[in-house]
């Protein structure tokens, strides 16, 4: 195999043909909108906003102490970012969740591309973790390594689903690959308040994760990559309690 053929195979994504229901529109004040895609975009944006403001969901509402910290946030995001869109897919859309990335997908390419990404990103993350802004943000005590992995796996896999699963695949079937850029907007919005270099890096990192989900048809590989990057950052910044 040549380099060109390997590249062509690695970047050849599957087709995402819309179903009859995907193609249905709704007219609002004379404006014709794609019903599912518009609903997914509005809901995903509203859920991110609720998470950022914590307007409706508080630790107390979840039965957790007010100082529950990262675990409270992870449980909240599981509810907002996983349970709510899953319920919408099943109950409102009456659709198969596998069409929205809840499957293994093309696992050979997913695993291979994930490993390649890990090799590239590991030295970059370790280098960034030594910077004062990153050490101040990620070096705060975050718990033991198993606690950190469990907490951020719950949180980040849920976040992957709402943006690069539910939203991405709903948009893909109506607006095509432009969806990979549209999902960047709420993703970047959710990172406001983090170190500035990380905020700008989400333009690249988020696009790569969206592309990976498009290529594999799954949120699994981007989710695992996201968890690895964040846990490595916390470890390298000194946030793990021994």
Q: Which residues make up each language-model segment?
A:
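Hydrophobic cores of alpha-helical transmembrane segments in multi-pass inner/ER membrane proteins
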Residues: 79-90, 151-157, 219-221
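Membrane-interface helix caps and helix-loop-helix hairpins in membrane proteins
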Residues: 131-134, 189-197
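N-terminal, membrane-interfacial amphipathic/helix-forming hydrophobic leader that caps
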Residues: 1-99, 234-242
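Functionally important transmembrane alpha-helices
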Residues: 181, 190, 198-242
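Juxtamembrane helix-loop-helix connectors linking adjacent transmembrane helices
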Residues: 59-75, 91-158, 169, 173
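Aromatic-anchored segments of alpha-helical transmembrane domains
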Residues: 45-54, 118-127, 184-193, 227-238
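Hydrophobic alpha-helical transmembrane segments
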Residues: 37-42, 110-115, 145-149, 177-185, ...
